[in-house]
Amino acid sequence: MSELVNKMENLSVGDSAQKKSAYVPPHVKRRMKEGGSEPSSRNTENFGNGGRFGGSEHNGFGGGRGSWFGGNARGGGPRSSDRGGSSRFGKWVDGKHVPMKRNEKLEVQLFGTPEDPNFQSSGINFDNYDDIPVDASGEDVPDPITEFTSPPLDELLLENIKLARFTKPTPVQKYSVPIVAKGRDLMACAQTGSGKTGGFLFPVLSQSFSNGPASTPDESGYYMRKAYPTAVVLAPTRELATQIFDEAKKFTYRSWVKPCVVYGGADIRQQIRELERGCDLIVATPGRLNDLLERGKISLCSVKYLVLDEADRMLDMGFEPQIRHIVEGCDMPTVENRQTLMFSATFPTDIQHLAADFLKDYIFLSVGRVGSTSENITQKVLHVEDIDKRSVLLDLLAASDGGLTLVFVETKRMADALTDFLIMQNLSATAIHGDRTQAERERALAFFRTGRANVLVATAVAARGLDIPNVTHVINYDLPSDIDDYVHRIGRTGRAGNTGLATAFFNRGNKNVVKELVDILEEANQEVPSFLSQIAKEMSYGGGGGKSSRGGRGGYSRGNSTRDFRRHGGGGGSEWSSANRASSGWGNANRTGSGWGGSSGFGGSTESWSNASKTVGSNNSWW
């Protein structure tokens, strides 16, 4: 990583942002010196058309993503009362958990091998996290754990954690495990790459393994007519949902708990077939879950745990009416009769007010410095005019040390155009954005994860939550207008205690985020370029904002994104929630006359809303 940083510093970009009259990429220069020919217009890996991967190959992904157990998941018949009947699952017999026998072939499939780079251990460089400050607020906060032990964790879960090569809990896991074990609700704010997924899976699965399944109605026939999950995990994007599902498969190994995943863009009939075979933990996007609830394929009456991952994004992107319908408009137990856990890297004050409606007597957990960036990530800001961005990008890629590079752009059109340009330069690149089909998006991610494409050009659809091992460099080709999106983007590298590099292309078109960008760099002990300081001063003297806007919800101060509003001001939660939602169209008032009720609230397998409610959650790429 230090070699890559040194190579970057030798590039002719920076404060002066000098333009090049006739740019020749470094790899072309090398070929010309060696007497090589000019690069061909296309490589042979078929990454063309913005990385659409021609042909019909699905590479094991697509509509049947949740079908990892095969066509006969529960032994070919209805689910028995002991929750067993298959060699792939444990059983719950006479109030006891009976794990299945170990399966070495399945273990390699789930956990990989130590030398496999695609299965990254969270133990690497993990001691870097030991000094991270943790602030827990609320009444009677339990003491944190320091190691993975039983108690409080179930013995089978500990074995699976060991198979995953997790050696010690992350800061968020140290607190979330005892908090959930005590039956408390939780709002957890932790820096990206800090183990938030394990932060909710570990305690929820441990309690499930120990307490067993909830009782469900007896149903006869080959399949159950409904699934009765005991845990529901909501995620804003399809990619994040499948990633959580992949982790759930690891940690439910040999147990009675069967995980499933449902999301839009995939074959709903296949997802229904999986649900009919039984589902104990469901990972879902809000739109598809509402669709399945309307179809009567899922009952939430047995839910003990509700988890919202990237909760701030879901509540801020127009998902609140859908989530409120799931939580309050169906048969889910009330807030007093379930545990609710919310996780994200940022929780702005206005989102905390909304989130508080779904929680009871909760503990607020803030892990890491305010600003939520990791010092494991080296941040570089280069002054690059729009006309020079492609040239500078090629320089950075030529200086790469061979790791994976994630390039963020603002528009879908730019993602395709930039990917095609990189392919023309004989670089293995692919793209992911909301206009891709689900099969195309999953295949692009598969190519990137395995290194067949070492450059992924992405819009915001991939910015949140995705954990791709070996991403050594994140490049913000287009800086976002929201500084929190910048935090989440650069968090795709430097994960799990590892080091990473994040480079941002900045020019005066990005001056709306300059003040907060300087704050982020200073808080993470990063170098602030002189041109950035100068523009920040100009903005300050000229009365410029420097505040980022928040899609239709107004600006907010980033200073409270990781602080409990109950301790740091902002008024009473219930008073704010009721008064402001009534005036701003949020919450129950927004549902009235918005297409709720009956069968018209959701549009079948495509998850489109009725015409009256398309203004809510209209960005379908998040479904």
UniProtKB/Swiss-Prot annotation:
Q: Which organism is it from?
A: Eremothecium gossypii (strain ATCC 10895 / CBS 109.51 / FGSC 9923 / NRRL Y-1056) (Yeast)
Q: What reaction does this catalyse?
A: ATP + H2O = ADP + phosphate + H(+)
GO BP terms, alphabetized? cytoplasmic translational initiation; negative regulation of cytoplasmic translational initiation in response to stress; positive regulation of formation of translation preinitiation complex; regulatory ncRNA-mediated gene silencing; spliceosomal complex disassembly
Q: Which family would the database say this protein is a member of? A: Belongs to the DEAD box helicase family. DDX3/DED1 subfamily.
Q: What is its main location?
A: cytoplasm
* Pfam families xrefs: DEAD, Helicase_C
This chain belongs to the protein called: ATP-dependent RNA helicase DED1
Q: Where located?
A: Cytoplasm
Q: Where on this chain is DEAD box (motif)? A: 309-312
Which enzyme class, named as a word?
hydrolase
Q: Which UniProt keywords apply?
A: ATP-binding, Cytoplasm, Helicase, Hydrolase, Initiation factor, Nucleotide-binding, Protein biosynthesis, RNA-binding
Sequence ranges assigned to domain Helicase C-terminal in this UniProt record: 392-536
Which parts of the sequence are annotated with region: Disordered?
1-93, 541-623
Please note every region of biased composition (Polar residues).
575-591, 611-623
Extract one GO cellular component term from the record: cytoplasmic stress granule
Q: Which GO terms describe its molecular function?
A: ATP binding; ATP hydrolysis activity; eukaryotic initiation factor 4G binding; G-quadruplex DNA binding; G-quadruplex RNA binding; mRNA binding; RNA helicase activity; RNA strand annealing activity
Task: Give start-end positions of Gly residues composition bias.
Answer: 60-78, 541-557, 594-604
Residues binding ATP are: 190-197
